[in-house]
Amino acid sequence: MELTRVILHPYTTEKTYSIRNKSEHETLTFIVDKNANKYQIREAFIAIFGLKPLKIRTTNRGPAKIRTSTARPGYTKAKKIAYIVMPIGVKVAVSKEEVEAANAK
């Protein structure tokens, strides 16, 4: 699997924002390829950001039922989420606003 296709995009929700700012370790969350393992995620993160993560945790989210106007329920897509923990003091700019703020300094 190509390293550029392992990490798909950042995953930003209220929960991930609170996890990121909760402890002294910065925790980043990404949607990753369903077939990627932790070693491939680590190598892709190092290739993209140039930083070595402290720990990586993954979880698989299955499709969830959603309401539709028909009698049959709809489903969301299944996804794999990677929680990447960085060492103390290491900050990574993931969102567009963070990159612009870092460049302005």
Swiss-Prot record:
Annotated InterPro entries: Nucleotide-bd_a/b_plait_sf (IPR012677), Ribosomal_uL23-like (IPR013025), Ribosomal_uL23/eL15/eS24_sf (IPR012678)
Entry keyword Membrane: no
Coiled coil: none
Gene Ontology biological process terms from the UniProt entry: translation
GO molecular function: rRNA binding; structural constituent of ribosome
Disulfide topology: none
Protein name: Large ribosomal subunit protein uL23
Gene name of the encoded protein: rplW
